[in-house]
Amino acid sequence: MLKNKTVLLGVTGSIAAYKIANLASALKKLHADVHVLMTQNATNFINPITFESLTGNKCLVDTFDRNFQFQVEHVSIAKKADVVMIAPASANVIGKMAHGIADDMLTTTVMACKCPVYISPAMNTNMYENPIVQDNMKTLEKYGYHVITPASGYLACGDTGAGKMPEPETLLQYILQEIAFEKDLKGKKILITAGPTQEKIDPVRYITNHSSGKMGYALAKRAAMRGAEVTLVSGQVSIAPPPFVKVVSITSAKDMFDAVTAVSKEQDIIIKAAAVADYRPAVVSDEKMKKKDDQLSIELERTDDILKYLGEHKREGQFLCGFSMETQNMIENSREKLKKKNLDMIAANNLKVEGAGFKTDTNILTLITQNEEVSLDMMSKEDAAGVILDKIKGMMS
């Protein structure tokens, strides 16, 4: 994913420095060329040898390292970098950068960089909230640097509050968002639905399905990485919200209908990957239903057909993609759905085929349009998301 990309990691003096070893390792696994620059204080928290072992590149601390190859190191590395991530970023380094002070390998290199630079502050809450630090971060943002809002939580000093460096996986997402993919969907608004709905029977019970939301979340994540403005309307799932995506959390089919129709007109692309209930209880009990007889009958009524509504109200130039999970006659049933609901494309899969069902990390899809059927091999849902977006982009161009 990151082959031929160079990532520069800047590590400063903070207890969170040890976590950047995981970030360096993750980047290397994605085939990035990873270089690490450390401040002298950072070496008190983690040994440079750790980064050298993980990246295969010399970890630079001293601006005047005589044992390194003869180049103006800070300039040559700055020219190579596709993105810089300074994490953890101490108040000291943030202050230096905001005022143009370049007195070590890290600050001199960043000063010479023309690529995007991300800064992830990590410090005590009182330090983070200090007006001087806040002003310094605003100054850096004014100069075009990207300052990542720290998380809140229990800090190494024993305090609880803002100032905690996000986890390496989150920092990785910022890097991937910047350099992993061509921004070929920039300027496009994409609405994606994901996950199951829940239809209440009483305060304790509800009707739902086995959808995990993985396919919809993969689509949202990949679309955002390719530059789209993404809105994800999601049922109740156990997946972390994708970064750089607006997530609207819903519970019932009615909730999803309202959330989708509120923003559908302004979207360029709508992908409905959610598994929405077709029926709901006609009457919802206010109290828990007690066991009385051996059998219980619940009257059901139809929910609103979201995809049908979208097809009927599709504006000119808007692309509408649905999903179809079948257990028999997959192509015939999916093609009928494509026509009946005025879709541009439908992604069909068979629940009975291993690797294509609910809650799996893989999928086996057939992309069906008015004129063709394209059968895909089994692949990860993230890769399948990329293929779906490629197909949509090709059909819209």
Where are these regions (language model features)?
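A cross-family phosphate/adenosyl-ligand binding-site feature
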Residues: M1-Y118, N124-G213, Y217-S397
